[in-house]
């Protein structure tokens, strides 16, 4: 994998326009911090037609994890985007291709700033939200936004921070997710529980990523009686398993677990039966779209989530999703549109090949397909680190759906659209 340049440089936005959905974008920046990082500088709002993407890469990280490209965090400064490659905290994310999908959803919302969420808020009669204090941005006194020191240390894609939820109405309640292990979160949980005379009976973890499980040690330090009450789909040491359909009950709340892999293999959502609401974890966020491990698996999980017909979503990041069915429809529609474009491009390339007198399936490599979709003048890093992995993942999903296939010719894997007559 090529290391990113040490200094900023302009890249024509046409190279990533279609993949990222950057309507009217003008410039993309690549770089890695050296000396005085511009992350410490104010990020000043730019005219609305401008989109700036700043990608940071630590060469030591790339050498250690050459196939890993961490997901983006998008700062809500009109249409400015910050990305940071970072090994610690949050999660070591995952699939360099599907982060492109995540960018698109966020960028579509950059005309508005993210809403402010209270540190502790009663968002329904049965649900109390406590922010994990691992926000991905900090608003400076001068009104400009810059990256939180916590962002540089770990969490990406955390938006206003990880949402942790205290669920129930009685003395004994359950907790969903534990944040990233930020001391301020532990203090908030302690004061909130003590102030309302609440005791925790169960701790349910949506998945293994560190911005959801990092607070477990603090909980056990403060409440050692919880040592037998930590639940996760694929349990770690000292944890108990959660099975699909398993039900947890406390006064005022019946919570049913639903296995929804995609964002991660062990991802669980939880349905709050009394409210017809779903704790969506990282599969569906309050703002934008989530990065995922396996596109086909994630889309299947979203369709399954649709079938459950929950009205409201309580996401692991971002504001309450007041119309969960519409949000799920939007997520699936956006991904389907990208699949259709790949298939249509393959068909067009076959037609052009046959028009030139060639025979066969008109199969092409991923590199050729990317060129056909995005032009010849692509920056090499944009091609190899973003567009090609993205298109390759979409092709794998389409192959599972029997819409494309590949053949090996000249030692190269070449893809073609399956046309049914």
Swiss-Prot record:
Lineage: Eukaryota, Fungi, Dikarya, Ascomycota, Pezizomycotina
Alphabetic keyword roster: Hydrolase, Metal-binding, Zinc
Cofactor details (free text): Binds 2 Zn(2+) ions per subunit.
Pfam families: Lactamase_B
Name recorded for this polypeptide: Atrochrysone carboxyl ACP thioesterase
Family: Belongs to the metallo-beta-lactamase superfamily.
Induction: Expression is positively regulated by the transcription factors brlA and laeA.
Enzyme class label: hydrolase
Gene Ontology BP annotations: secondary metabolite biosynthetic process
UniProt: Zn(2+) 2 binding residues: 211-212
Catalytic center residues: 211
Catalytic activity field: atrochrysone carboxyl-[ACP] + H2O = atrochrysone carboxylate + holo-[ACP] + H(+)
